[in-house]
Amino acid sequence: MRVLACLLAALVGIQAVERLRLADGPHGCAGRLEVWHGGRWGTVCDDGWDLRDAAVACRQLGCGGALAAPGGAFFGEGAGPVWLSELACRGNEGQLGLCHHRGWKAHICSHEEDAGVVCAGQRVANSRDDSTSPLDGAPWPGLLLELSPSTEEPLVTHAPRPAGNPQNASRKKSPRPKQAKSTRAPLLTTGAPRQERLRLVSGPHRCAGRLEVWHGGRWGTVCDDGWDLRDAAVACRELGCGGALAAPGGARFGPGAGPVWMDDVGCGGGEQALRDCPRSPWGRSNCDHSEDAGLVCTGPAPRLRLADGPHGCAGRLEVWHGGRWGSVCDDAWDLRDAAVACRELGCGGALAAPGGAFFGEGSGPIILDDLRCRGNETALRFCPARPWGQHDCHHREDAGAVCDGMPLGYVPPTAPTDSNNSTPREAASRPPSTMTSQAPGTAGVSPPPASPTVLWEPGPEAGSPQLRLVAGPSKCSGRLEVWHDQRWGTVCDDSWDMRDSAVVCRELGCGGPQQPDPAAGRFGWGAGPIWLDDVGCVGTEASLSDCPAAPWGKHNCAHNEDVGVTCTGPPGLDSISDPFSWSWIPGLGRDRDAWLPGELATKPSASVTASVLEKTTTKAPGKMPKSTKKWVTKNAKRPTTQPPVMPTTKHSRAQSPPDLTSQTTAALTTEASRRPTSEFTRRPTTEAPQRWTSHTTATLTPQAPRERTTKTMAMLTTQGPQEMTSESTIKSIPQASLEPSAEIPEGSPESPKDPAPSPSVSTTGESGLFRVRLADGPNRCAGRLEVWHAGRWGTVCDDNWDLRDATVACWELGCGKVRPRVGKTHYGPGTGPIWLDDMGCKGSEASLSDCPSGAWGKHNCDHEEDVGLTCTGYTDYDDYPPWTWDPTSREDLAKGTTTAGVPGHTLPWRTTRRPGSSSPAIRRLPDTGSKDGYKLPWTWDTPSGRGLAEGTPTAGKLGPTLGAGTTRSPGSPPTLRVHGDTGSPRKPWPERRPPRPAATRTAPPTPSPGPSASPGPPGPALTSDSSRELTPHSALTSEATSDAPDTSPPTPDPASRTNPDLILTSPDFALSTPDSSVVPALTPEPSPTPLPTLPKELTSDPSTPSEVTSLSPTSEQVPESDTTPDLDTTPYSSTVSEYSRSPDPSPSPHPTTTPDPTMAPDPITTLNPTVTPHFPTTPHPTTTPHPTTITHSTMIPDPTTTPQPFTTITHSTMIPDPTTTPQPFTTMQPTTTPHSTTPHPTTTPHPTTITHSTMIPDPTTTPQPFTTMQPTTMPHPTTTPHPTTTPHPTTTPHPTTTPHPTMTPDPTTTPYPTTTPDPTTTPHPTTPDPSSTPVITTVSLPTSLGTELSSPTLAPTVKPSLHPQLTFTAPAPHTSTSQIPTLEPSPALESSPSRSSTATSMDPLSTEDFKPPRSQSPNLTPPPTHTPHSASDLTVSPDPLLSPTAHPLDHPPLDPLTLGPTPGQSPGPHGPCVAPTPPVRVMACEPPALVELVAAVRDVGGQLQRLTQVVEQERQERQALLLGLTQLVEAARGLGQLGEAVKRLAEMAWTTSMPAPTTTTPEEEERPLRGDV
């Protein structure tokens, strides 16, 4: 008995569990699992719920295998008891009742844990005789079609489903099946007023068809006169369709309508838009529509596909990249990633994101890994991920996706349904009845019968055509099916051509064939028998049955060859310009949420009037039983969405309220026979639902553009009156209060240019206007729920939020029904207040404002709990689709987001956001350059019925209005523009600030030697103006750096900045470069004490000064004589004048000049155009044969005075010198000062260094030529008499400087290293004293050792001084100096004179020869004035410092004056005491000073020589060490080889002595080969 009792109990349990149903899913084979037990429907807890349990449930429901087993109330929370928990199926049970479980109602779960099921959708073939149902077996049509980017879009279209974007199916460019030819057409044609100036219609896909142009408010065609591939290429590019394949004329895609706007188009092929091509005036042509031009473009390549799944919307995700299909790794793969992929594929939302090669392992490369989508991207390519092809996965980790949509033409199987009209919530209290009917949505299971009910397949009415077009966008387009032997079957495409299509279209009353030759399978694979093959119509037959063909059922085809036909449309009606749009028919078809072809799309009758439902029950055929009472109470309050103005849409949509359900199946079937369609076939057909919905009660309202109403009927839909049956309850009422939104000129930024709908979902309550919207979603029917209250948008907390609340929100938004949510914050956290919490809708309210909830703003939530909502679709056809193809961005854009291809227009729907409001969450559409790439700059505002910039209230009559395009509040960030939106100005790139010149660099920047060098303006260069720049302040300013560059011009030449060396280029010209300008910058303000003016005599040749001039930044470039003034102007100007001040040099101040060593002044140098004068002080150094050296010399001038002192002074002096301007130079030079220091010696070769100093002066003085200074240095070299310097100036021509490198030779200058200051000087030196070897200006510093003189102070030009490497080569003359040889070793010396010139650039970095014209040297003459300053500045004093303190490399010695005619000037020309052309007192002429200078230079030369020797010795030691290392390496290598040989021998010996052990493993055998030493 106990056994019997157990068996009985088991049987009872099984019987109870046999009754299953799936509720609230996208179709009958997916949803929340509910079980009938104890007279009530209840749910199943997700504890222990997995794919094995789901597989048993799916099998029991007749829905094939299980794809996913989501928990967590994925399909919404159910009602009633939780019957089962902890199910533990093995997966092979026949019924869920056979699985072990915890017991009936034994659980610890809540409805938040309700389990769901996603089945493959394959129905067992027990409901019909044949197994040809589309549900049987094979994967869905076209889903696996392999399309290469070059092929047309897949022929099979995705099922346009209600997923958040009903239009997805048609708008996606995925490699997956595309909606037959029309998926794109409607997008291109709806919204004429939009900015998309071109569109293609009547073609096989969106990138082929008859070309139409929008102009004058109308669409018109293009005449084919002169139309060729070049014209087509421009049009294809403008449309975003790639290249042109063909340019057919002769109305190849059918004749158009309206005006012929363009004729005789003559594009060259490179134009940006068709309107830019030569053509006849608008509207003037000699053509008719039989000559309409067409296009066939390559079209965008497919990007995604789902392979090896049960249908096209489930499978392994594959991506097309690099010419191959590859898979996606499941690392980090989740529902958000799958949601993006499903949306891009046009398959709605994501139900599951299986990994682990759930759908089998792919082949080919793994294209993507670590995808991290947020869930609201429009395409997978916008999600963060590793670079293409980079991964760490194997194909066993291939990711898959299960979408809630079905491919076009796919009818999900319906599990047995319970016929009682109850919703899941209500069903709990009502036992199921025995009646059954097919329910597309939530499939109910009739308790007794466990197997699905078999429905008969309706055939055509008597006398009607025995054929039909299904799975297409309209009744006149789709897959051809023929009725025979009481069954519908397909036709094979063998031998099918336009003549056969013509017969079919004529028989169906659909006009003529519209497209040349629709590819087979374009409208999906059919099911059932293939009735006809090898049809051979002549084209004149009255019926397809009259055409010759193979015997019925005889064929050699498969369903992938099913014929598709597209006709122009009924001849009696205006053809629909976009016949391929899809209508959302909630109550039709077996899938309550299925998108069916828009055969409803018939031109609305003019007599259509607004009406309100008196009777709320709609007889939607096939609709699953649902209680209609929930919608009865508040229908009148239901706001409506207004359709956009679509000139091209000549049809309207008929719809019944989303939740209205059929009362009985019988009623549905009886009325369905009026037309020959098989509305009741198990798969959706193209038949207009109204045909069979005689009982459907619909509200008809005229569509007005931008109409807004706060009071409207329960639903605004349009329907051809002829299609309404007498049984429909329609009450004629005054037209709904629809009023167009305020008129704004279309071109104005505030006017919505897009006729997009502006649905109004505002209601007026006690608290004022109530608005709701969905933000940050892919379209207006999906996103984060936001509510307008108290002047602000806020969010809704998800506490207690359930399906009933969501249903009311979707209804209020006019977005149909609720789709399964994907996480509470699927659309991200919002901003602003959280207005509502604890919502408690019953589901029958017309607005959320009617539902009980907490007080406004009272909540215990944060934005992580914001409600996200995804509705099924749109309730008004005219509002569909909300996306349109934008040729500019080449993407589908939300209506109003951007105008297609029309530059210069602002977003039609841009509206101002409330001041202070956060910037709208922006979702980037494809190809937008915006950095906030993922958000749309707008959100759908239900009250206003248009997209608004996020954060802005809608322009409701009762609330703040926002004109489309109104400006944003000042503080709010601008909304992002989609790529195609050319209207709004682009954000300017952040301005790039020009690099600021280094403060310390002086001479280099002076590159503009020419100007400064120019003899003409020598004086001016030094004018007070330049002095101004020379002023310590100016110099000092970091600007002193190249900034001050323009010797002549205030700003240094960029070149100068970059190549300080240029300044030193030629001895005379040394400072001519812009560096002079730099010099000013160099002048350090700090250098307070002006260097004692060197004896005016120090000033070198005017010629040299001229060069200096070029150096001086301020230059005024002419610095020459003027330079002096400039220097004067500068506090240190006087110093600059120094050259005149030559006498000063002798004073210790001169040494001060040394400080000038440009080092400090370097900046000064920069400052100094004036600085140049500074060098003038140094003039003597300038004199130093090397102009380069001179530079230092200039500093040295002081040396003349007391070279050594100023060496010491160098730094400080330089600074004071800045007073002259040059002084700043000095400042820089400080390091240089040491010039005399050994450092320079290191540079020894750098006599050129001396040049450097010269350079410095050059800048300032230009004229001053620091030559004077140089002389000081020079003397040192050979030019014992600082006169040499003078000659140097001659040399100054500094051409030598150019040679500056030549200066290098000046090694004599080396001693000059003292000139190190030269760097500083450099600026001046160059300029200064060209005569006195102005060349010295050239910065030899870098010379000999390639080190820079301390003179770097010259920074810009003098820079070399800072870097010993900067060889400032003095002119060859310097080389003449006895000491030059010494310096020769140094790098600077290496350079030939010409090179010196390069070196001159003072900056070791810039070696380019900056040779200013020697003529400049004369210009330098003026510098004399500067001489005083420069003299002091240049004082070689630094030299002394240099040797002791500065590193030799830092301050390469200036060549001992290198007065030698480096540049070719002979020291003799002027004679040691020759005064510059403009009489200048040259300190160099004073024997005592010269003697001291020469002595100092020689000392430095000796030091440099010694240093060179040490360096050479070290180099040799390093070479020896390197050689030893090399030998050691060789030895080691030899040992290794030896070891290898020994091992091989040992191995051979081993093998010979012992037979190879059979047990030896390959690894063991190989080991000896690897052996280590």
Curated annotation (Swiss-Prot):
Annotated GO MF terms: extracellular matrix binding; fibronectin binding; laminin binding; scavenger receptor activity
Compositionally biased tracts (Polar residues): 431-440, 654-671, 687-702, 711-735, 1101-1140, 1335-1354, 1364-1380
Biased segments, Basic and acidic residues type: 672-685, 924-934
Tissue/organ expression: Highly expressed in monocytes/macrophages and T-lymphocytes. Highly expressed in placenta and spleen, and also detected at lower levels in colon, and more weakly in lung, heart and kidney.
GO biological process: defense response; defense response to Gram-negative bacterium; defense response to Gram-positive bacterium; detection of bacterial lipoprotein; innate immune response; negative regulation of interleukin-8 production
Keywords: Cytoplasm, Developmental protein, Disulfide bond, Glycoprotein, Immunity, Innate immunity, Receptor, Repeat, Secreted, Signal
Disulfide bond residue pairs: 45-109, 58-119, 89-99, 223-287, 236-297, 267-277, 329-393, 342-403, 373-383, 492-557, 505-567, 537-547, 797-861, 810-871, 841-851
Record keyword Cytoplasm present: yes
UniProt region (Disordered), positions on chain: 153-192, 412-465, 614-769, 895-1475, 1554-1573
Compositionally biased tracts (Pro residues): 1004-1020, 1083-1093, 1144-1160, 1278-1328, 1464-1475
Bias (Low complexity) ranges: 1161-1175, 1185-1277, 1381-1401
Family annotation (InterPro entries): SRCR, SRCR-like_dom_sf
Glycosylation sites: 168, 376, 420
Domain SRCR: 20-120, 198-298, 304-404, 467-568, 772-872
Description of how the protein assembles with itself and partners: Interacts with LGALS1 and laminin.
Functional note: Binds to extracellular matrix proteins. Binds to pathogen-associated molecular patterns (PAMPs) present on the cell walls of Gram-positive and Gram-negative bacteria and fungi, behaving as a pattern recognition receptor (PRR). Induces bacterial and fungal aggregation and subsequent inhibition of PAMP-induced cytokine release. Does not possess intrinsic bactericidal activity. May play a role in the innate defense and homeostasis of certain epithelial surfaces.
Name of the protein this chain belongs to: Soluble scavenger receptor cysteine-rich domain-containing protein SSC5D
Gene responsible for this protein: SSC5D
